[in-house]
Amino acid sequence: PAPCEAACTLNINSQPVGIKSIEHAIIDRAWAEGWVQPQPAAHRTGKRVAVIGSGPAGLAAAQQLARAGHAVTVFEKNESIGGLLRFGIPDFKLEKSHIDRRIDQLIAEGVVFRTNTLVGAVQDAATLAQGVTVVTPEELQRSFDALLLAGGAETSRDLPVPGRELAGVHFAMEYLPQQNRANAGVALPAPISAQGKHVIVIGGGDTGSDCVGTANRQGAASVVQFELLPMPPQQEDKALTWPYWPVKLRTSSSHQEGCEREFAIATKVFNGAQGQVTGLTTVRMQ
């Protein structure tokens, strides 16, 4: 979101410098012109570092450690590298080719990637069936000089209200990654599809917006987004908010594609019939 733009002094009485767009233009030109090249370390330290997790933090750390001369191995439990960038952010917001070209650069700099490898408990039947290899922390400690934990946070915030167990109620991190996998050509055993359905997205943030856009692309009959907080102002009072990131109404491309937005709504009950969600009981907040 480029929060620094809100703190730009020009933003007090005019428009801030669009540094996000400027930096995008610079790096896009750099890749197009071939200015971005691998930078392998000139000298090796002889030290081995294991990076656990291949999301933004893991990839950034792996690159800097490799350039410092360390031998870096990145362990990723999923089938592809990228973490939230690859599986959480929809393709219509982030084309995965941007991730792939950075991974190619890291490989050229000496970084080794091990996918389908879970760092955790002892191997069991469930992980074996999924084709995932389990490596214990003790094994890594014996093989590496340092471990960097960059696993991220994948525990969803639940909504513990009656009816939560009904079929058809999904976490965003169940819904978004499976669609990204489908886009990549992965066969899904039980895909979650909004096609022809009336969809309610609970949560008014960026993740909710991503779910709105995904549901629209799947052919949802209708999409409604619920936000617990009251509707923010269309325009912030800069005398009060500057230099902080302002709270104001933000409309994404997903909203523009088709979405009804409701504010100050709290969901109290998931209603259902025969184990399937059929509606919600909500209250309007004051």
Segments the model singles out, each with a brief description of its role:
Residues H70-R86, V223-P233:
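Glycine-rich FAD pyrophosphate-binding loop
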Residues R48-T73, T207-Q218:
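N-terminal Rossmann-like FAD-binding beta1-loop-alpha1 element of flavoenzymes
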Residues I26-H43, D104-T115, S156-Q218:
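Glycine-rich dinucleotide-binding loop and its adjacent helix/turn
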Residues S54, K77, G204, L228-M231, ...:
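Cofactor-binding loop segments of dinucleotide-utilizing enzymes, especially the Rossmann-like FAD-
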Residues S97-D158, N180-P189, N216-Q286:
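A Rossmann-like FAD-binding core segment of flavoenzymes
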Residues P90-L94, E165-A167, L240-P246:
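Short, hinge-like loop/turn segments at secondary-structure boundaries
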Residues P1-A2, W35-I52, A57, R86-F87, ...:
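Ferredoxin-like iron-sulfur electron-transfer modules
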Residues A2-R29:
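Iron-sulfur (Fe-S) cluster-binding segments and ferredoxin-like electron-carrier domains
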